[in-house]
Amino acid sequence: MPELPEVETTRRGIAPHLEGQKVSRVIVRDRRLRWPIPEDLDVRLSGQRIVLVERRAKYLLINAEVGTLISHLGMSGNLRLVEVGLPAAKHEHVDIELESGLALRYTDPRRFGAMLWSHDPLNHELLVRLGPEPLTDLFDGERLYQLSRGRSMAVKPFIMDNAVVVGVGNIYATEALFAAGIDPRREAKGISRARYLKLAIEIKRILAAAIERGGTTLRDFIGGDGQPGYFQQELFVYGRGGENCKVCGTGLREIKLGQRASVYCPRCQS
């Protein structure tokens, strides 16, 4: 599933080609996503100029002169730029054609993504309850410490809770906990303020590094320019269950936490 760095990589790839451009038409080949694509999307968006492309958590906000297209890539979706008229392959559900001769093409084999329309996107039901962005000053270790008091859940699903902080998905939660030396199974309430301060620093560092390297390529993800991400080359623990720790050589253990695979080093993390 594309996580925050992959979505931000997509935003950076498509924004320069969309902002300031006028939409000539919208072609919808299949409306059946997680929520149906609005039947009047072509009418709403065609003829409008795209003003700004933003990201909130893992949602892309394509702001037109009137209204905003909210897009989520789901489990396996991607947005990329193609030439207008390029024949569509299977699973290529939407083309947003621009007067520049380019089209923004949405592909989603599993159809778990979304394309919705809103006149007030930040107050849309999908976005209004989201926590702070991890790379802003609104998120820090003190927030983690305060929100964790009384929480008996494991620390990994705690930091993956979008009400606590957005965008810390399975890959980056696994890596950040390793970098901070915290066992993912530990109760959130049992972790000290000092360790949460360290964890927040590592979350910010790892997400920023992943964005710089274009995200992590796992199966389906490619950036908005059609290129893969390269952060996978720097993963210390994610996806390496049974292999040896790159730091101490101990065998990495893989467990299930909150229905997700989690890998950790029993020596480096406590």
Swiss-Prot record:
Gene Ontology BP term (one): base-excision repair
Residues annotated as binding DNA: 91, 110, 151
Alphabetical list of PROSITE patterns matching this protein: FPG_CAT, ZF_FPG_1, ZF_FPG_2
SUPFAM superfamilies reported in the protein's UniProt record: Glucocorticoid receptor-like (DNA-binding domain), N-terminal domain of MutM-like DNA repair proteins, S13-like H2TH domain
Keywords of this entry: DNA damage, DNA repair, DNA-binding, Glycosidase, Hydrolase, Lyase, Metal-binding, Multifunctional enzyme, Zinc, Zinc-finger
Entry keyword Kinase: no
Catalysed reactions, semicolon-separated: Hydrolysis of DNA containing ring-opened 7-methylguanine residues, releasing 2,6-diamino-4-hydroxy-5-(N-methyl)formamidopyrimidine; 2'-deoxyribonucleotide-(2'-deoxyribose 5'-phosphate)-2'-deoxyribonucleotide-DNA = a 3'-end 2'-deoxyribonucleotide-(2,3-dehydro-2,3-deoxyribose 5'-phosphate)-DNA + a 5'-end 5'-phospho-2'-deoxyribonucleoside-DNA + H(+)
Cofactor notes: Binds 1 zinc ion per subunit.
InterPro entries referenced in this protein's UniProt entry, alphabetically: DNA_glyclase/AP_lyase_DNA-bd, DNA_glyclase_Znf_dom_DNA_BS, Formamido-pyr_DNA_Glyclase, FPG_cat, MutM-like_N-ter, Ribosomal_uS13-like_H2TH, Znf_DNA_glyclase/AP_lyase, Znf_FPG/IleRS
Superkingdom per UniProt: Bacteria
Purpose: Involved in base excision repair of DNA damaged by oxidation or by mutagenic agents. Acts as a DNA glycosylase that recognizes and removes damaged bases. Has a preference for oxidized purines, such as 7,8-dihydro-8-oxoguanine (8-oxoG). Has AP (apurinic/apyrimidinic) lyase activity and introduces nicks in the DNA strand. Cleaves the DNA backbone by beta-delta elimination to generate a single-strand break at the site of the removed base with both 3'- and 5'-phosphates.
Family per record: Belongs to the FPG family.
Quaternary structure annotation from Swiss-Prot or TrEMBL: Monomer.
HAMAP family attached to this UniProt entry: Fapy_DNA_glycosyl (MF_00103)
Protein's name in the database: Formamidopyrimidine-DNA glycosylase
Organism field: Pseudomonas fluorescens (strain ATCC BAA-477 / NRRL B-23932 / Pf-5)
Name of the gene this protein is made from: mutM
